[in-house]
Each structure stands twice: as structure tokens, then as C-alpha cells.
Amino acid sequence: MDKLAVGPGYPEGVIDLARSPSDNIRAIAAAKGVAPGDIIACVLDRPRHADLIAELRALGCGISLISDGDVAGVIAVTDPDTTIDVYMGQGGAPEGVLAAAALRCVGGQFQGRLVFRNDDERARAARWGVTDLDRIYHLEELASGDVIFAATGVTDGTLLKGVKRRRDCITTESVVMRASTGTVRWVKGEHHREPGMTC
């Protein structure tokens, strides 16, 4: 899935997968009142993104390359502490739906378009009822209703710390978000081997 996401505070329609990455960067910069070189794009560090990265570098904008976790990369656009303005690139469609669900909870814009590598994938999409193979899906189409997003870190990442094994317990870090209230809860869990023990 091609993915394009920005956090809250931008005018509706500031991003559009039908436009080039450079045009999207320029639109985001104009909405922010800065030069394109002041925009930071988060991109999954994969060979398939070589042309995208080259285009962004030619434009002069900053690039934050991540090794994995494009859901966390999309969520990063909502966190002012990351300084990331936009997420761009291709990744799995299920992850696109998860990222859209998180953005529904905290605000932002997301667009996704299915990418097909071969005729078998196109045929499978047709069997699932996908008739427009070039359709651009918007946030509300991918995550509608009273969305609740929950994630727990398994390994350390940019969004959550991974599972830590201690002498008498295991600790976890989770986030739970709800669209209807905009509530975000960060949960640090202690899972004890025996009741009454502490970490």
C-alpha cells in the first residue's frame, strides 16, 4: 500500500496521493508557512524507496529513515517532539489500516492506495470485491466508527519499549487510543511471576 500521512492542524486535503511527493512536500510547507527544506519526511528504509528518497533529497527536505515499524512512523507525525511532518512510502496494507486507526484517534490525515506486484495479487483483490485498483482510500474509509487502537511493544521501537525480563517480573509498555474521546493512555505493565511481588 502507498501511504501518505500528516498529523493534526493542517487544512483538509493538504496531502494527495495523486500528486508527486515533491508537490505534497510543497503543499505541507505552504500550509506550515515554511520552506520545503524545513519539512521532515519519515520514510521506511527499503530499496523500493530509493527513487522517493532521491526526490526528497533533491527537494532539500529532511528525511528520517526508519528500519521498520511504519505504523509507528505514521503515528510519529502526530507527536511534536519527533519533528516529523509527513510519512511517505509503501508498506503492508494491514499496517496501513492500523496506522489509519491510530490517526483517527488522535487527528491527522491519511491516504492509502493498494499496490499490486503481479496478476495474482490483482486477481485476489478482485475476488475480495476490489474493482478500482487505483482507488485512493481516505482515513475514514480505512478506519470508521468508534475506533480503538491498542499496541504493545514486543521489541524496542520509536513508539514503545519492548518486553523486558527482570528477575521477578516482566514489564511491558502499551498505548491505547480511542477516537470518540481522543483519549490516549500509555500503560506500563508489570507482570509478576507470583502475586504480591514487585519488580
Predicted regions and their residues:
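IMPase-like, lithium-sensitive Mg2+-dependent phosphomonoesterase catalytic core
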Residues: 1-199
